[in-house]
Regions:
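Edge beta-strand at a domain terminus
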Residues: 1-8, 17, 52-54, 84-86, ...
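N-terminal glycine/threonine-rich, aromatic-flanked beta-hairpin/loop signature
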Residues: 2-4, 11-14, 22-59
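Generic short beta-strand segments
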Residues: 13-19, 63-67
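Beta-strand elements of well-folded, non-transmembrane domains
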Residues: 16, 37, 68, 81-83, ...
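Short, cysteine-centered beta-strand-loop-beta hairpins and adjacent loop/turn segments enriched
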Residues: 20-23, 69-71
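Short, surface-exposed coil-to-beta transition loops
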Residues: 27-30, 47-50, 72-76, 96-100
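Short beta-strand segments that buttress and anchor functional surface loops
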Residues: 41-46, 61-68, 89-92
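Mid-chain, well-packed structural core segment of small domains
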Residues: 53-85
Length: 128
């Protein structure tokens, strides 16, 4: 488990993104990012992902691995604490889109964020 600075530790509600806007942000549940250093997750739009953190001097960076709907994806990102207590973040999809986001402190979700589905979850039951 990585030691996350206390000012970052917890759950964050992703309130807006520069590329995808706010429409559909919560389509599969409240858009959230967990920063605990153990079993962290990201959920927004149709993205479910596992997150691995790295502590930097004035920010946190992360790698993520998951799926957008049933398409496996991965990427990188970073967050920096603002003076108003919110996070400024960046999210990049490997070989794809990049977006900034703003996140606000939040309570943990009532139900845990599900594991990202794989293409097998979509196509595994089909017989060709």
């Amino acid at each position: 488990m990585i030691e996350i600075p206390s000012e970052y530790r917890g759950w964050w509600r992703i309130a807006e993104t520069s590329l995808w806007g706010e429409s559909g942000l919560d389509v599969i549940g409240t858009a959230l990012l967990s920063i605990t250093g153990s079993d962290d997750r990201l959920r927004m739009h149709c993205l479910l992902a596992y997150v691995n953190w790295k502590v930097n001097t004035a920010s946190l960076s992360f790698n993520w691995n998951g799926s957008w709907e049933f398409d496996e994806m991965s990427g990188t990102g970073n967050v920096k604490l603002r003076r108003d207590g919110r996070l400024d973040g960046r999210l990049a999809i490997k070989n794809g889109d990049k977006s900034t986001f703003v996140a606000e402190p939040a309570e943990p979700p009532e139900h845990s964020i599900p594991h990202p589905p794989s293409w097998r979850d979509k196509w595994g039951s089909r017989r060709w």
